[in-house]
């Protein structure tokens, strides 16, 4: 029988413990917890003065990031003072930061608010986060921003003290730390001097006007704020054009560039490129090869590899049209429906081998009644056969096709991903073969031919005693050829549309619904279409109104129209004298 070990009293060590669960901590427990829970971290892409995403970033020599417009307004109100540390700061001490960004953004507000894209390392293209060690390499009045891992691996350890972007020399003293995950206290909002003194976040003049007008602060919305700003600018532009009597529906032919004084214009370091239709999900590997071999020309762009027509079509769910083939045997003909949508490689292999006559004269070497019949091996041993690529190809189990009925056509194999040229027809549903053999077709006509094959006697090794030969396989409808024709037709149609667009568009594009034709300069002119409504009324009026000469008017007598007498109304009249 055991004894209890829990003491009925509190020990000295438990009473004097310094943690929050000590009985001696008293009422200070909640106060200590509140002090540790009040930590607020400024995101790396936020201005330290406005506490909002920056547009044109600059930094101080100690690595504090500001927006150039915001810090300019602050220094006008508080000359020679850093809002974060309170130390002396002048405009000439600010360093312009060159951030790189990718072409597309996956997160709200992750990039600069005046353009699209996430902030990235310009060499490795890794997206910056709040946990990335970010540094800047200073070159006078500007600095290029990198991840610390890139600079440490390619500059410091390699002893190559040249900037990886513009090839400028630098020293270790030129490296400025913008964000260090191990030193989160440097971005703690509770330590900012201007917040301790009760000052509010500094805003630009434009942001102050928006706040006074009660509008939404678009800068705090990230990429959504850009759309709001563009919509508001378009409405304001249309209102001004309407006041000046201009045509608000006319498209602008020129874009004006903002020329704000003291604003640092930062151009995108990566150009947007429209990917080709047959672009792969992986790159050509030239950048990796040039980094690892000095014998290759340096390459920094992650160019996408291009797929061939065959590789492009052999992606699942690319070619969705079904194909048809006729298998001619000495027992009769079988009409087969092929499914390239879910098994494109198996269907392509079967069609190409059939078109080259690979299956002509090939016998079915294995026949098991109430199970299946197998063929496709020119050697007839069951151990031969070769695919159209000359090697095994992978299984395709992602589709919904299963061995759910008689006449199912599947690939025979020796194990996982060992498909070649052999195939088999199922005599009955065989669900135990699902996800073991690729289903790529089914018999849709002359299913009774399978019954004739099933009734052929076999020897002890399931080999038919009477040969069942494949005379030929005729492809009635090639889905891949049809896909290529449709693709070429679509490309030709797209080129024609682009050609017409460059020439100014069609007649329908040049004419509005009111019948006005749009000129090349954007103005409008009336056409005959504008007079289509009511044009016959003018002709009728002209025909019904005869022309009168002034000489004829002299012989016509004129008279005054007699004054019409007022009709007396019946009834009782006025009742005033009653």
UniProtKB/Swiss-Prot annotation:
Entry similarity comment: Belongs to the cyclophilin-type PPIase family. PPIL2 subfamily.
Compositional bias ranges of the Acidic residues kind: 551-560
Domain of life the protein comes from: Eukaryota
GO molecular function: peptidyl-prolyl cis-trans isomerase activity; ubiquitin protein ligase activity
Enzyme Commission number(s) of this protein: 2.3.2.27, 5.2.1.8
Gene Ontology terms: biological process: protein folding; protein polyubiquitination
Residues covered by the PPIase cyclophilin-type domain: 321-475
Name of the protein in question: Peptidyl-prolyl cis-trans isomerase-like 2
Pathway listed: Protein modification; protein ubiquitination
Biased composition (Polar residues): 538-548
Catalytic activity: [protein]-peptidylproline (omega=180) = [protein]-peptidylproline (omega=0); S-ubiquitinyl-[E2 ubiquitin-conjugating enzyme]-L-cysteine + [acceptor protein]-L-lysine = [E2 ubiquitin-conjugating enzyme]-L-cysteine + N(6)-ubiquitinyl-[acceptor protein]-L-lysine
Function: May catalyze the cis-trans isomerization of proline imidic peptide bonds in oligopeptides thereby assisting the folding of proteins. May also function as a chaperone, playing a role in intracellular transport of proteins. May also have a protein ubiquitin ligase activity acting as an E3 ubiquitin protein ligase or as a ubiquitin-ubiquitin ligase promoting elongation of ubiquitin chains on proteins.
Higher taxonomy: Eukaryota, Fungi, Dikarya, Ascomycota, Pezizomycotina
Biased composition annotated in UniProt, kind: Gly residues: 569-578
Keyword Glycosyltransferase attached: no
Chief site of localization: nucleus
SMART domains hit by this protein: Ubox
InterPro entries per the UniProt record, alphabetical: Cyclophilin-like_dom_sf (IPR029000), Cyclophilin-type_PPIase_CS (IPR020892), Cyclophilin-type_PPIase_dom (IPR002130), Cyclophilin_A-like (IPR044666), PPIL2_U-box_dom (IPR026951), Ubox_domain (IPR003613), Znf_RING/FYVE/PHD (IPR013083)
Region named Disordered: 240-260, 505-578
GO cellular component, one term: catalytic step 2 spliceosome
